[in-house]
Structure formats: C-alpha cells, structure tokens
C-alpha cells in the first residue's frame, strides 16, 4: 500500500502483485488466480531475491496463484509470510510466517472484501508502519521522512520542524524545502548549531 512515508528506494521498496495484473483491479480476469506458476513468474520479472520478503494475501488461504508464489519464493531463500482468514490453510503451510485472522463469517456469504479485506488492510498498515519505524522514518508518533508531494504535507512538515526546533514558519519551511525531509532539516539545523 502506498504511503506518505518517503522510503529510500535502496532500502525499502514495496510492490503489489495481483492475479490478472493491472486489469484485474478494474475488471475480472477469469482463471488468473488459479494459475499456480504465474505468481512466481511475476516475482521473477520483478527481480525477487533472498533480500526480499513476500507476503501472500488470500482470505481463503487456498488461492493457487499465491500458494505457488510463496512455495517458490521460500525454495529460493526469500522470507515469506501470509495473511489469511482461514486457519491452517494450504497458503499458511507455505509461509515462513502466517498471520491467520479470525474474523468470523462475512455478513454476505462469500464477500471476503468485507471483514477479511478490512482486516488484511489493517495488518498491512501495521506491517508497513513497523518497517518505517525500524528504518528510522518515524520520530515519536510523527512521519519525519514523508514525501513532500503536496501543500498539505509541506505544511505538516513545516509544523513538525517548528515544534521540534522552536522556529518560525518561514524559517522552518525554508529548512524543509532545502533539505527535503523533516528528519534531514532537523539534523542539518542541529548540526549547524553545534558547529
């Protein structure tokens, strides 16, 4: 899931794959999820290696596209995980780490986009937030390495610098725009004050 956190491209990349490719985001691609080999083929196209982590997602835990990708990734030394709503599923058996949510029956039988989909999204948010914290992209409860992609985020970053350093708005914003991130602006300012 894309976020506002500016993860350095050499350190943390995320890539989402879906059975049926980009088309499947808007239209059904019949049979795509039943191809047990295609998931791994797509991972290879994205140059997967043993430094990566693959997280398979399927509410049922029985989707061949995901199972095949996890099986082959693990065979090639890639750390694998999965998120499913079906305990002891075939997908969980192929993952190094299985997250098996208990969500109970869906309100509309078979509509896994409801409780299962919501739970999966929450877990992905927790994983990506934890990664950003471990990479030092978060200070306290603030994203200090966010992408300055719009006015709202520039203003948010400016306020963070103002709070942290006690600077006025103009000075804080100039630092932010000069250094490209809240973290870099704060570090540069503190360094300049010490030297």
Question: Locations of the language-model features?
Answer:
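Ligand-binding beta-strand-loop-alpha-helix segment within the catalytic cores
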Residues: 21-53
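Short, amphipathic alpha-helical interaction segments embedded in low-complexity terminal/linker regions
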Residues: 131-195
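Short glycine/serine/threonine-rich phosphate/pyrophosphate-binding segments
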Residues: 50, 60-69, 91
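Gly-rich Lys/Arg/Thr-decorated short loops/hinges at beta-loop-alpha junctions or inter-strand turns
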Residues: 16-26, 139, 154
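Short, well-ordered beta-strand core segments
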Residues: 54, 80, 98-100
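Short alpha-helices
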Residues: 84-141, 151
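Single conserved hydrophobic/aromatic residue that forms the stacking wall/gate
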Residues: 1-8, 12
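Surface-exposed amphipathic alpha-helices with a cationic face
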Residues: 70-75
């Amino acid at each position: 899931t894309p976020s506002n956190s500016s993860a350095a491209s050499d350190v943390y990349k995320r890539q989402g794959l879906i059975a049926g490719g980009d088309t499947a985001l808007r239209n059904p691609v019949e049979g795509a999820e039943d191809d047990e080999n295609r998931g791994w083929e797509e991972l290879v196209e994205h140059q997967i290696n043993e430094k990566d982590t693959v997280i398979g997602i399927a509410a049922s835990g029985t989707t061949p596209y995901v199972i095949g990708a996890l099986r082959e990734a693990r065979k090639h030394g890639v750390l694998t995980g999965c998120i499913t709503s079906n305990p002891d599923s075939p997908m969980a058996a192929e993952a190094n780490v299985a997250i098996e949510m208990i969500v109970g029956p869906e309100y509309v039988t078979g509509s896994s986009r409801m409780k299962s989909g919501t739970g999966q999204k929450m877990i992905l948010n927790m994983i990506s937030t934890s990664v950003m914290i471990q990479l030092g992209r978060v200070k306290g409860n603030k994203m200090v390495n966010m992408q300055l992609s719009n006015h709202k985020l520039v203003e948010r970053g400016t306020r963070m610098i103002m709070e942290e350093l006690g600077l006025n708005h103009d000075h804080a914003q100039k630092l932010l725009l000069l250094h490209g991130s809240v973290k870099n602006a704060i570090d540069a300012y503190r360094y300049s004050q010490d030297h």
